[in-house]
């Protein structure tokens, strides 16, 4: 037994200078752990609700109410429970909140407690977090989906697509994939400089040049890959996070690259891109409630490319179940703060994998030095992780943790590589 004895919380800052919640847990055997909660810039309508203070302090974004929720309600609800009984702990958290969207105590308060308990239990068990959560077979290192060019809500430019990513699919190890990604990142900076484009950074460490559109951005990245001596499509593939909900409105549809488009027109554009570039993944290509559009797009190109539901599914097993029944998307983006507890996150991943959906573990644009998602990516065998460019310490912290995990696993480690993606699975 490893009984939860004390629970504490504080307000800290995330990578964008906004407040977030950090929770600490002490067990009766002396084991101690803390967890910090991320937050997003582009958030889905169906996400669990963060508790923010409002008012003038921190522009209304303070989290003193969430901290107080941890201290006054969450702590009494979980103190005395065995920390290794994660499902019991998380159910106690859900019962204490009592709302379907976690809006009373706040998903940020609940998640901080949930993750801190898991970390403390791992410490008490003498196991790394990935091993504690994932069991004896956790051994697959994810492909890093590096967001090296930022647009949309992550940058103050005219580029509508939110993230342009590189995926080092041809590497033999995670260590090699990280090096390849970093080399492409630095090569892209030199390409941008040569063309007189800005090299300032967006929220997630990627460059934020004001380029003409999607194809120009993909072309710039393709040139950067070639500049490193790596082979586009074989060594390094491309991926997008469109975040289409950000430019969709009822009545006018998708306002994209200067014109209003229908779901069918957006789908035709994606089909054209997938044929022209080695794109392995497109996240949120359509609005979070455009189920008909998603189903049609999945039928059209789902056998060629990974179609990832982020705002569509919000890591919620009920939303995912609906998507599976309808045949919408073929992959789930996993963000722990969208759903609010570790148990619900693991349930969503399990549901996805049992139904043939791929999963991609993900950070948020407002991150901290917390490395939990690196361990979770290995624990659940997701095969993919999205945690920004190889720049800014809150992003690099996750990559460095994966290096440690790969080293820890030794000969047992396996890098997911190209088989993580439907494009290659369908090609055989």
Curated annotation (Swiss-Prot):
One GO biological process this protein is involved in is: glycolytic process
Positions annotated to bind (2R)-2-phosphoglycerate: 162, 335, 364-365, 386
The organism's superkingdom is given as Bacteria
Q: Which cofactor does it need?
A: Mg(2+)
Q: List the InterPro entries.
A: Enolase (IPR000941), Enolase-like_C_sf (IPR036849), Enolase-like_N (IPR029017), Enolase_C (IPR020810), Enolase_CS (IPR020809), Enolase_N (IPR020811)
Q: What is the similarity comment for this entry?
A: Belongs to the enolase family.
Q: What is its main location?
A: cytoplasm
Where, by residue number, does Mg(2+) bind?
A: 241, 283, 310
Q: Give the pathway listed in the UniProt entry for this protein.
A: Carbohydrate degradation; glycolysis; pyruvate from D-glyceraldehyde 3-phosphate: step 4/5
| UniProt-annotated location(s) | Cytoplasm; Secreted; Cell surface
Q: What is catalysed by this protein?
A: (2R)-2-phosphoglycerate = phosphoenolpyruvate + H2O
List the catalytic residues.
204, 335
- Keyword hit for Cytoplasm: yes
> What GO annotations for molecular function exist for this entry?
magnesium ion binding; phosphopyruvate hydratase activity
Known function: Catalyzes the reversible conversion of 2-phosphoglycerate (2-PG) into phosphoenolpyruvate (PEP). It is essential for the degradation of carbohydrates via glycolysis.
**EC class of this enzyme?**
lyase
The EC number(s) this enzyme carries: 4.2.1.11
Any one Gene Ontology cellular component term annotated for this protein:
phosphopyruvate hydratase complex
Binding note for cofactor: Binds a second Mg(2+) ion via substrate during catalysis.
Protein's UniProt name: Enolase
Matching entries from NCBIfam families are given as: eno
- UniProt cross-references to Pfam families, sorted A to Z: Enolase_C, Enolase_N
């Amino acid at each position: 037994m490893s009984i939860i004895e004390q629970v504490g919380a504080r307000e800290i800052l995330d990578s964008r200078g906004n407040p977030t919640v950090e929770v600490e847990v002490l067990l009766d055997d002396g084991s101690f752990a803390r967890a910090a909660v991320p937050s997003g810039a582009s958030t889905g309508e169906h996400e669990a609700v963060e508790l923010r203070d409002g008012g003038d302090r921190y522009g209304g974004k303070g989290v003193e109410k969430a901290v107080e929720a941890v201290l006054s309600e969450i702590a009494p609800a979980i103190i005395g429970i065995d920390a290794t009984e994660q499902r019991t702990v998380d159910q106690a958290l859900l019962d204490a909140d009592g709302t379907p969207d976690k809006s009373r105590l706040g998903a940020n308060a609940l998640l901080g407690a949930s993750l801190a308990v898991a970390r403390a239990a791992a410490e008490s068990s003498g196991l790394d977090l990935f091993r504690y959560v994932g069991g004896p077979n956790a051994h697959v290192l994810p492909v890093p989906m590096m967001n090296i060019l930022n647009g949309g809500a992550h940058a103050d430019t005219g580029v509508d697509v939110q993230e342009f990513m590189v995926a080092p699919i041809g590497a033999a190890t995670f260590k090699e994939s990280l090096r390849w990604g970093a080399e492409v990142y630095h090569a892209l900076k030199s390409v941008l400089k040569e063309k007189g484009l800005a090299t300032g950074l967006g929220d997630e460490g990627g460059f934020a040049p004001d380029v003409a559109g999607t194809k120009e951005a993909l072309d710039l990245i393709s040139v950067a890959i070639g500049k490193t001596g790596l082979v586009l499509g074989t060594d390094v593939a491309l991926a997008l996070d469109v975040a289409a909900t950000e430019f969709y409105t009822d009545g006018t549809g998708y306002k994209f690259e200067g014109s209003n488009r229908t779901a069918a027109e957006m789908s035709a554009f994606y089909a054209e891109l997938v044929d022209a570039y080695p794109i392995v993944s497109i996240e949120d290509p359509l609005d979070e409630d455009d189920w008909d559009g998603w189903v049609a797009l999945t039928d059209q190109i789902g056998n060629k490319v990974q179609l990832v539901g982020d705002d569509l599914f919000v890591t919620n097993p009920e939303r995912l179940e609906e998507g599976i029944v309808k045949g919408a998307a073929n992959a789930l983006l996993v963000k722990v703060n969208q759903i609010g507890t570790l148990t619900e996150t693991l349930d969503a991943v399990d549901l996805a994998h049992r139904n043939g959906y791929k999963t991609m573990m993900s950070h948020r644009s407002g991150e901290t030095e917390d490395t939990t998602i690196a361990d979770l990516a290995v624990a659940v065998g997701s095969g993919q992780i999205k945690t920004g460019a190889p720049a800014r310490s809150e992003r690099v912290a996750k990559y460095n943790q994966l290096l440690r995990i790969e080293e820890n696993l030794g000969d047992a480690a396996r890098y997911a590589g190209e088989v993580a993606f439907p494009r290659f699975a369908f090609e055989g």
